[in-house]
Structure formats: structure tokens, C-alpha cells
A protein has these predicted regions:
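A charged helix-plus-loop insertion that forms the helical arch/lid used to bind
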Residues: 2-18, 62-64
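Glycine-rich anion/phosphate-binding loops
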Residues: 15-32, 67-72, 115-118
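Acidic-leg catalytic submotif of subtilisin-like serine proteases
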Residues: 29-43
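Active-site cleft segment of glycoside hydrolase catalytic domains centered on the general acid/base Glu
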Residues: 56-70
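Second-shell residues forming the walls of enzyme active-site clefts
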Residues: 68-187
């Protein structure tokens, strides 16, 4: 939004003829403009891997349905933002690509298929950790295969077990905003 340069969004970057160059240009321009006004953290990139029809809360925000491509483009954004003095925030851990509900309003349950966590959801976040991302934002979704009934934001199994221990992340963890009435599953 003005006075900043507007970009078409991650979905357009991911579908472009030169996604790597566009991701780098987006992050470089964003870092320069944020720095000019004294900002030092961007709540980006979105590292959710699209899994079927993208719902409104993710429309235009995901780099696509290929975990490796999301990881590569996310890494470019992280590297370029942070080289420009802006802390990057990888979000929404451990991934929102399989939900049709807006987790800002209602807590969705994300039912992952066997092996999907490792081969899809964690691929971009593992790359972000390897890239040295400054912060990770958690999602409010519930992942029954990891911690039944507990939103990721409040889950020791997700935050400590998955993010800290399994991925080896030791940086800042922040939560996403939540507008709903209750933080329990199904509410």
C-alpha cells in the first residue's frame, strides 16, 4: 500500500516466467522501502503449500502447490530481506495449505495424510530454518496427527517437538492474530 511499491502477490510470483528474479526483486524493494521509514521486520514470506483450491485467507499469498518451489522462493525472499536489514518471518507453521477455513476466525483441524507433514508442510520451513530466518509465525490450526485438540500456537508438540527439536530452530517464535471466540478445536 502507498507509499510502498505494490507487488502482485506470491501466487503471481510463483506462476511467473521468472519467479526467482521476481521473488528477489520483491524482497529487495520491500527491504529498501521498509528501511527508509524505519521498519525492521516483515511478516513474510508465507510458506504454506497450496493443497487444492486455495481459500480466501490464502488467495494470492502462497507461492504454489510444489513444496520445493515454495521452499526455494521463500528462501530467496528470506535471504534478500535479511541481507537488506529486514527480519523475515516464515509463516504459518506448520502449514495451512490444506484448510478451507480462515484460522483467524475459527480453528480449523488439518488432517494430514501419512507422510504429508514431512514431504509437503515441513519442506519450506526446513529451508527457512537453514536460511537463518529471523522468526517463525505459528498457525492457530489444530493438527490431530501431531497434537489432537491443541492449536499449533499452544502446542508443546508443535513448538518444542517439531520446530525447536526436529527442525533445530532456535530463533523467535510469534503467533498469528486470532479474532475467534475460543482457541479450542472446533470452536
Amino acid at each position: 500500500k502507498a507509499p510502498f511499491t505494490e507487488f502482485p502477490g506470491n501466487e503471481s510470483i510463483g506462476r511467473s516466467e521468472s519467479p526467482e528474479a521476481q521473488a528477489e526483486a520483491f524482497a529487495r524493494t520491500t527491504a529498501e522501502e521498509m528501511g527508509l521509514v524505519g521498519l525492521n521486520m516483515d511478516l513474510a514470506p508465507v510458506l504454506d503449500v497450496g493443497r487444492g483450491p486455495v481459500e480466501e485467507h490464502l488467495r494470492g499469498r502462497t507461492f504454489g502447490e510444489d513444496p520445493r518451489r515454495v521452499a526455494d522462493l521463500g528462501s530467496i525472499v528470506i535471504r534478500t530481506l535479511q541481507a537488506g536489514g529486514i527480519m523475515a518471518v516464515a509463516k504459518h507453521f506448520p502449514g495451512l495449505g490444506r484448510t478451507a477455513e480462515d484460522p483467524h476466525v475459527r480453528l480449523p483441524e488439518i488432517l494430514l495424510e501419512e507422510g504429508e507433514l514431512e514431504t509437503v508442510n515441513l519442506v519450506p520451513f526446513r529451508a527457512a530454518v537453514e536460511e537463518g530466518v529471523a522468526a517463525v509465525m505459528t498457525s492457530h490450526a489444530v493438527y490431530p496427527s501431531i497434537d489432537p485438540g491443541t492449536p499449533a500456537t499452544l502446542s508443546e508438540a508443535v513448538l518444542k517437538g517439531l520446530l525447536r527439536e526436529r527442525l533445530g530452530y532456535d530463533g523467535l517464535i510469534i503467533t498469528d492474530t486470532y479474532k475467534g471466540p475460543d482457541r479450542r478445536a472446533g470452536q
